[in-house]
């Protein structure tokens, strides 16, 4: 699925509002090579301890497949270029496919909250 320009702007605004700690949002609206996804994908990043030499970069990616959206939490690089994963890169969480970006966003937030509860000592 590819998005029109006005839909891209709306999608960016939606994910920026849903995940305000993530920055440097970017997107692609086409297949650029065999190692990338077809269709529309957008991603933002959050850096844990950015002052460190080997800071860890977490990415949220929302990707389309056919007429559906899915959400992904990765570390090291965003889901869009996942076929070129390197040492230290990890695929952490995924959602199922949803009809809307909003539904995929809500589902990814729920998966992140579930992971945080599991890791919490409180």
Model segments located where?
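Short arginine-rich
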Residues: 111-121
């Amino acid at each position: 699925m590819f998005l029109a320009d006005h839909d891209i702007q709306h999608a960016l605004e939606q994910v920026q509002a849903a995940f305000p700690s993530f920055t440097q949002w970017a997107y692609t609206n086409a297949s650029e090579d065999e190692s990338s996804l077809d269709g529309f994908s957008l991603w933002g990043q959050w850096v844990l301890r950015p002052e460190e030499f080997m800071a860890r970069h977490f990415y949220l990616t929302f990707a389309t497949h056919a007429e559906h959206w899915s959400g992904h939490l990765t570390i090291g690089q965003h889901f869009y270029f996942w076929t070129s994963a390197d040492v230290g890169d990890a695929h952490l969480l995924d959602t199922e496919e949803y009809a809307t970006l909003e539904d995929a966003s809500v589902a990814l937030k729920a998966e992140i909250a579930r992971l945080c509860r599991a890791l919490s000592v409180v």
